[in-house]
A protein has these predicted regions:
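Feature activates predominantly on carbohydrate-active enzymes
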Residues: 1-175, 181-188, 195, 244-246, ...
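Substrate-binding groove of N-acetylhexosamine-processing glycoside hydrolases
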Residues: 20, 56, 60-63, 69, ...
Length: 492
């Protein structure tokens, strides 16, 4: 499953090339995670600046996927994660909450406090289902698949606004389930089997048995220690068909967290086989603007394919040769793509769903900055200086060994260069914070000027690379490069 809703909407040519390679790895299902990036006729103002896939493009991709033995499954989030639809003047009334609010974070998951903007539909608003029907009637005819993933994960706003009284009276879990069933009826009426993310229903174990039996629950989790075994067993006990859904761990990292991903992919395969999962979905998310490119994800696509088919015979040592032969066409580039995913370990920081390399440079947009800096950046400045400098040196060394010092060559090589250089700037920023903290203005100005110069080069190279892979412009993906330039200039 490829995220196409956080900043990168791939061109049809990119997706066709992706499908060819996925087929080489015996991957037989592809989903494109969609919030607002299908070209719905009535909502051009929602998707236009992001780019969107058209019905014609989907039909062409669907045809080629069928020829390759891949089921292209439609994917449209239908409850939460609909922020950009709910900012549309005619759709604001469908939002559960009308204003942004500060989320207190979650100690269990490691999520920091930050601002949430309205993103969840009000299940009790009379216009909600007609809105979804309109999306489904336009989207689904473009797919030949018998399945449809309606999402419905992370409904953060539920019970905070329009449905508060209903949730207080009936319980949030029951309100969620009732709306999920209403969506299920819409999907069934269109001849599809409904898939949905299982995170919310798992919070209400007693309600799992009340799910319709002809659905597929998607049991997702992305950390090495995610309790797939426990969660999968709950769906199995209730006789609900389910997939296990691990991830590539590339999002909010720039260059990967391959150590975590390998453990996560393996745990999902093991638990899925034991509990009778009917599928294994490798997810590749784009949180934080999706700055990480496909080149960073390919090592874990390959690892996930191997583990999904037979975890007992998986041999990590074979990944680089296979990637060199089938994806990169070059052993040095393949090795760099694999090795970069372990560089973050040198910082000595264990974080959930991110690394400092990804989060430092891609910090939030200006309106969210104050809250993020108050709560989310504190520990970056505490990383030991020698670890930061060592990490920077290792990134530079890997680029040098792979002869990837310039943004040239194949598209995959360009992507490795850009991702690694952005990670290197994150190291520079951490070092800049450290010298600033001790009042070393000479070093602070020197490093700051170097960062601004490198960010300017990155911005130009990113814009030159972008149209080779993606639709629209990179403004939703690489805007943080300009934000960081402004930050540093203001401090020099």
């Amino acid at each position: 499953m490829l995220d196409i809703s956080r900043g990168r909407v791939p061109k049809l040519e990119t997706l066709l090339d992706l499908a060819e390679h996925l087929a080489d790895f015996k991957i037989n299902e592809l989903q494109l995670y969609t919030e607002h990036t299908f070209a719905y006729r009535n909502y051009k103002s929602v998707w236009q600046s992001w780019g969107a896939l058209t019905g014609e493009e989907i039909r062409k991709l669907d045809t080629r996927c069928r020829e390759l033995g891949i089921d292209l499954v439609p994917n449209q989030n239908s409850f939460g994660h609909l922020r950009y639809f709910l900012e549309h003047p005619k759709l604001k009334k469908l939002a559960e909450v009308s204003e942004p609010y500060e989320d207190g974070g979650d100690a269990a998951t490691g999520n920091q406090e930050f601002v949430r903007r309205p993103s969840t539909l009000a299940p009790n608003h009379p216009g909600t289902l007609p809105f979804l029907r309109g999306l489904y009637d336009e989207l689904l005819p473009n797919f030949s698949s018998d399945f449809f993933n309606v999402g419905c994960d992370e409904t953060w706003d539920l019970g905070r606004g329009q449905s508060k009284r209903l949730c207080d009276a009936r319980g949030k879990g029951r309100v969620y389930l009732d709306f999920l069933k209403r969506i299920h009826r819409e999907v069934s009426a269109r001849g599809k089997t409904m898939m949905f993310w299982g995170d919310i229903i798992l919070k209400y174990p007693k309600l799992i048995r009340r799910l319709p039996k002809n659905v597929v629950a998607l049991n997702w989790g992305y950390e090495a220690n995610h309790p797939f075994a426990k969660e999968a067993a709950q769906f199995a006990k209730a006789k609900i068909p389910f997939y296990v859904c691990p991830g590539t761990s590339t999002w909010q990292t720039l260059i990967g967290r391959h150590d975590n991903a390998l453990a996560n992919l393996h745990a999902a395969a093991k638990a899925g086989k034991k509990s009778g999962a009917i599928g294994y979905l490798i997810t590749d998310w784009g949180d934080g603007g999706h700055p990480q490119p496909l080149a960073i994800s390919w090592p874990m696509f390959a690892a996930g394919a191997a583990l999904g088919w037979n975890s007992k015979t998986f041999d990590e040592r074979k990944l680089v040769p296979v990637l060199a032969r089938d994806v990169f066409g070059d052993s040095k580039a393949a090795k760099a793509a694999f090795d970069l995913g372990f560089v973050h370990k040198k910082l000595g920081v264990k974080a959930i769903n991110e690394t400092p390399l990804g989060t430092v440079i891609a910090a939030p947009r200006p309106e969210d900055r104050e809250l993020f800096c108050r709560n989310g950046l504190k520990w970056f400045a505490k990383i030991r200086r020698e670890r930061v400098l060592g990490t920077f040196a290792e990134i530079e060394d890997l680029l040098r060994q792979a002869k990837l010092l310039s943004c040239s060559g194949s598209v995959l090589e360009m992507e490795l260069n850009l991702a690694a250089r952005m990670a290197a700037v994150s190291c520079m920023f951490m070092f800049w914070q450290q010298v600033a903290a001790v009042g070393n203005k000479i070093a602070m100005n020197c490093v700051g000027n170097l960062m601004v110069a490198e960010l300017q080069k990155l911005d130009a190279d990113f814009k030159a690379y972008w149209p080779q892979r993606n639709k629209a412009t990179p403004k939703h993906c690489s805007a943080f490069l300009q934000w960081r330039m402004d930050d540093y200039r203001n401090c020099l």
